[in-house]
């Protein structure tokens, strides 16, 4: 449906049609896993299968960063949510840098999407220069999910531009989209640049640097 295409372009577009459309880390190697259908909908079983695939094959494909620009607004205490968190946390324990969208159900508190509520991974919110909150500019956009989580974990961990982002679309076209899904590959791409310069950095190192 173009969601993943848009995300990939933000992170790693090689600017085939001009330098104005360069991604954050254009020389990155991309491994794409499709877990949504043509309408942009998906089921948790497909999501878990994708996470399991990364867990099994990340060394073979030299994967270091996992960008997850999907999530669920469900209850943190449900068995389905706990299962999802278990799989996401396993990727972090594998040494992977896991960046997950915080969701678009803000600005109220406790609105971080699952699995962005995990205390281990890096949860990304969306910033908007045109939105002002509590007298401060350049902070979260009005829709960006906010913490704390029900476990009192402060989220998101970092915010990045996510409103009116121009990137790749279907059929060799471009389009504008907004959301924490768009902000997440900005962070993932930035981490890719850091790992290119400092390949010995671990996911824990990067989790400290972004602060």
Predicted regions and their residues:
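Hydrolase catalytic cores
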Residues: 8-11, 31-37, 66, 111-114, ...
């Amino acid at each position: 449906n173009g969601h993943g295409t848009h995300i990939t372009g933000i992170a790693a577009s090689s600017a085939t049609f001009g330098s104005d459309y360069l991604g954050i880390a254009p020389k990155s190697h991309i491994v794409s896993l499709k877990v949504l259908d043509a309408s942009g909908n998906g089921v948790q079983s497909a999501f878990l299968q994708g996470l399991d695939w990364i867990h099994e094959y990340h060394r073979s494909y030299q994967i270091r960063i996992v960008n997850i620009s999907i999530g669920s607004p469900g209850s943190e205490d449900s068995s389905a949510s706990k299962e999802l968190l278990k799989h996401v946390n396993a990727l972090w324990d594998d040494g992977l840098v896991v960046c997950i969208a915080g969701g678009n159900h803000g600005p109220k508190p406790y609105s971080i999407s699952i699995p962005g509520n995990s205390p281990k991974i890096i949860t990304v919110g969306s910033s908007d220069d045109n939105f002002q909150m509590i007298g401060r500019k350049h902070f979260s956009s009005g829709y960006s999910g906010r913490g704390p989580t029900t476990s009192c974990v402060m989220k998101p961990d970092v915010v990045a531009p996510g409103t009116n982002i121009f990137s790749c679309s279907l059929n060799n076209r471009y389009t504008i989209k907004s959301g924490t899904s768009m902000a997440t590959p900005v962070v993932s791409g930035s981490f890719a640049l850091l790992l290119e310069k400092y390949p010995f950095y671990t996911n824990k190192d990067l989790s400290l640097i972004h602060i």
